Regions:
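N-terminal hydrophobic/helix-forming segments and targeting peptides
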Residues: 1-141
Length: 141
């Protein structure tokens, strides 16, 4: 029997766990805890792809169900003197789609900062080039 509320809670917890491309420790820990509740163990290959083996009634056939644990994101490359940040695109961010999005910056020291992606010319009533300025890593912060 499917426990819908528990399944939705688990899904929400996974979705809200930071897991930008190449940054898997938190999502792997969370997934290991979840599958552990069912008596299973999380395994990894050399690329850190996670697997859970669930024995079936007929072990002569193997079924693999896959899903992404990571998401697209950005990596901070440099903090400029004026406080703006220079980012590197991870996994295919389309800068036209992320303007105005809330973001979290996770540091090597374990701190997390909350911010927002904005374009350098973000308002048409203030910046003449707001409609024409390219939305890319050089004009977003």
């Amino acid at each position: 029997m499917v426990k819908t509320e528990e399944m939705l809670n688990n899904l929400e917890e996974l979705i809200n766990t930071p897991s930008v491309v190449g940054f898997y420790p938190e999502i792997h820990k969370k997934l290991a805890e979840m599958v552990g509740k069912f008596g299973y163990e999380l395994e990894f290959d050399n690329k850190r792809t996670a697997y859970v083996r669930v024995p079936g009634k007929d072990s002569s056939k193997i079924v693999c169900v896959g899903a992404h644990l990571d998401t697209i994101g950005m990596q901070v490359r440099h903090v400029m003197d004026n406080g703006w940040i220079e980012v590197k695109n991870l996994g295919g961010v389309n800068f036209h789609n992320v303007e105005g999005e809330n973001v979290y910056i996770h540091t090597r020291s374990g701190k997390t900062y909350e911010g927002m992606v904005i374009c350098k010319s973000h308002s048409t009533h203030v910046f003449d080039d707001a409609r024409s300025r390219e939305r890319d890593k050089f004009n977003e912060a």
